[in-house]
Amino acid sequence: RGEDSPYGDAWSFLTNEEGITNFWRDGLIRNRSFENVITMGMRGENDTAILGADATMEDNVNLLRRVLKTQNQLIRETINENLDEVPRMMVLFTEVEAFFYGDEKTKGLLDEPELEGVTLMLSDNNQGAARTLPTKAMRNHKGGYGMYYHMDMHGGPMAFEWIGSTYLPKLWEQMTAAYEFGVQEIWVTNIGDIGTQ
């Protein structure tokens, strides 16, 4: 990263589309001989919204549509023209979940054609409760659903690291509910790093 880098100097698809696209292309080429589930979408630097706090819902959703279209095109060019044969996922965490559903003024990404065949990774609320589960109408999504669940959290406004704060019966209850609601494609657990004694 830097002025002389082929990836540009900003983690911004809005101001550095060419650099970010080169970064993604090189990553796809570098890893194409391995078994992968490709992560779709984009967040801002340091786990922030893609456009920052001042941007509107519509601005964010429209930029994410461009991101998804670019990513799918890169996958077709470098991995396989048939996207149905390429495992892909998009994590709907914090602000990305809001962009997925949209609001009363802005249609979100819920029925976005670029997400067809992409596993939609739902998440918990950082305290062990699922933020959302797919409605009956949503369960027909071609890519299915997955879960990204925190057993360790480092971030504002609180952090719980290196301690077992997830009550195991609650974990069982939440994951059982998720499974019964069709969240069965991919499960990822954030367990943090290894603490030393």
Task: Show which residues each predicted segment covers.
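Structured mid-domain segments that build the active-site/substrate or prosthetic-cofactor binding neighborhood
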Residues: 122-128, 135, 139-197
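Gly/Pro-rich turn-and-neighbor structural signature
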Residues: 14-142
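Contiguous N-terminal and early-domain "leader" segments and peripheral loops that mark the onset or edge
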Residues: 1-2, 126
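Active-site-adjacent "subsite" loops/lids of carbohydrate-active enzymes
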Residues: 2-25, 142-148, 168
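Glycine- and acidic
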Residues: 5-9, 47-58, 152-164
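General structural signal for secondary-structure boundaries
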Residues: 12, 102-103, 107, 166-169, ...
